[in-house]
């Protein structure tokens, strides 16, 4: 059972849903008179994005990118790879990047530069989790759900080797799981 691999629950399902609702209200206000392109960063942001968009009461378009700087490792390789690109042009659009966690910041820094190059009108970032202690790139989210400590967190989209994404909460993974 997955729960035996979790050292502790860091953020409960109830806390997540409350924060998602608050972020949705902020984003409704931010994008009230626009038609933003909400870009979910796969795979991790999928549960967060699915819940978040239900609370954004304005028109928006959705698309997804799959990019990675981790592979199956716990440490960013520093090299960002596009696995799935957008189907939609960002040129002249207000872009909202929806991310599960900002750790090294390398992936988001790459995406922001890519969308600038592709001539996006504006770029904002919403992340469920922010881990400033892991930062290697100078990047900040415009909207943050929770700040998390320097621990390996999983659940609600976040994984280790493609496992634990389906936990309904954010938990700290026992080191024995990823150190073996």
Swiss-Prot record:
Pathway: Purine metabolism; IMP biosynthesis via salvage pathway; IMP from hypoxanthine: step 1/1; Purine metabolism; GMP biosynthesis via salvage pathway; GMP from guanine: step 1/1. Its main location: cytoplasm. Diphosphate binds at residues 43-44, 165. InterPro entries: HGPRT, Hxn_phspho_trans, PRibTrfase_dom, PRTase-like. The active site is at residue 103. The keyword Ribonucleoprotein does not apply. It is found in: Cytoplasm. GO terms for molecular function: guanine phosphoribosyltransferase activity; hypoxanthine phosphoribosyltransferase activity; magnesium ion binding; nucleotide binding. Belongs to the purine/pyrimidine phosphoribosyltransferase family. Purine salvage pathway enzyme that catalyzes the transfer of the ribosyl-5-phosphate group from 5-phospho-alpha-D-ribose 1-diphosphate (PRPP) to the N9 position of the 6-oxopurines hypoxanthine and guanine to form the corresponding ribonucleotides IMP (inosine 5'-monophosphate) and GMP (guanosine 5'-monophosphate), with the release of PPi. This is Hypoxanthine-guanine phosphoribosyltransferase. It comes from Bacillus subtilis (strain 168). The lineage of its organism: Bacteria, Bacillati, Bacillota, Bacilli, Bacillales. The gene is hprT.
